[in-house]
Curated annotation (Swiss-Prot):
Homotrimer. The keyword Lyase applies. CDD domains: MECDP_synthase (cd00554). Disulfide bonds: none annotated. The gene is ispF. PROSITE patterns: ISPF (PS01350). This is 2-C-methyl-D-erythritol 2,4-cyclodiphosphate synthase. NCBIfam families: ispF. One of its GO terms (molecular function) is 2-C-methyl-D-erythritol 2,4-cyclodiphosphate synthase activity. A divalent metal cation binds at residues 9, 11, 43. The record marks 35, 134 as: Transition state stabilizer. It comes from Actinobacillus pleuropneumoniae serotype 5b (strain L20).
Length: 158
């Protein structure tokens, strides 16, 4: 049996912290306003994984009202969510992540992002795709106010 999940997340810029995308620190003058480290890509991916096995979403598993997740490393959240996916008897066939941002440019970091996700999901980097696009200066991402991300996860029965 195969299962598919979709995730979406968005965070605004504005906090003095590192900008984390797909578990990689991307040089930029500001970070995200968020309860955790704000990694929109890993949050969207976590939602996709959880959704594929009907385990809800990142907010259910790691509520932002719980102080233990304050400034949490999103890689740890992804790893825990994937542990729960595996406990349901599924593993990653492939994942696809789309980062929607006017800036900063993601291309120099894509290979590292793919490998980081592959490491966290215990799969080959060829099972992970990360790409970035802009909104041609339209909307909040186009104005440089934040970043959005979508992710899809295809899971197969172990």
């Amino acid at each position: 049996m195969i299962r598919i999940g979709h995730g979406f997340d968005v965070h605004a810029f504005g906090q003095d912290r590192p900008l984390m995308i797909c578990g990689v620190e991307v040089p930029y003058h500001t970070g995200f306003i968020a309860h955790s480290d704000g990694d929109v890509a890993l949050h969207a991916l976590t939602d996709a994984l959880l959704g594929a096995v009907a385990l809800g979403d990142i907010g259910k598993l790691f509520p932002d009202t719980d102080m233990q997740y304050k400034n949490a490393d999103s890689r740890k959240l992804l790893i825990e969510a994937y542990r729960q996916v595996r406990a349901q008897g599924y593993k990653v066939a492939n994942v696809d992540v789309t980062i929607i941002a006017q800036a900063p440019k993601m291309r120099p970091y894509i290979d590292q992002m793919r490998q980081t996700i592959a490491d966290d999901l215990q799969c080959d980097a060829m099972q992970v795709n990360v790409k970035a696009t802009t909104t041609e200066k339209l909307g909040f991402t186009g104005r440089g106010e934040g970043i959005a991300c979508e992710a899809v996860a295809l899971l197969i029965k172990q």
